[in-house]
């Protein structure tokens, strides 16, 4: 987002514990001790835990079980501010802006998205605990002091993007519930009178029925929607069944954003460069925010889960890449 004369990135910083040897896997978590939040370390020894799967660098799980049986994450994430005068060269603050609390974020904070409404910046983010990944809300006016508003979407629900103004008297947000049985991770749209209490949920968009498509695995919110003379533009992410993440875009009706006017058939950004295909979790481009200056769309995105990058588009080119839908 932009604040005064600076471009502000609110970055997820994932930190892990240095282990003594290759047999150890050390897990940082936040726990309440004598009324205070403290970081504690849980240590697994691979040789003593044959029932556990350590093959995924992101987490420890029960061997042979499904993803819902994750026991711990291997890192603990907080949110930290990076500042820039030109949108390219950033200085990262020395200390965290927001650190996880034991009650809501004992396993960390991820995927922050900033929506400016009037003079307040609302930050929704994924709050992770052993009970699942939900979405919480924080607000600020100056990026120095922050007010917590708690969980607004209970687990498992993430990839929330809030529209920057009321529509027909209510706040509107995309969200992405993750069903455990029937269904797939798909986009829903909800409404709220106050940004805290959300309801009127409606299914918005599902995954592609084409099993060879770039978006046949999962789909979710990306950047905060922005308004143009043609309607709302919503840049989103999707993945195929091999977890290759790309970005696409919707054009939505100004007065009813549940109506899709047009969408991109092919990705507008996909992992091609080495820094996008290789990394902590390769073949990923994933955005949580963008800026719009005149006809230019500036997307800040994560690459391979361990870098932050920038890509610029002409808005006219984005519209030209869309296929319009008969309503």
Give the residues covered by each predicted segment:
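Beta-rich carbohydrate-recognition and catalytic domains
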Residues: 2-107, 115-161, 165-217, 227-280, ...
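Beta-rich, blade/repeat-based domains predominating
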Residues: 112-113, 161-164, 222-224, 285-292
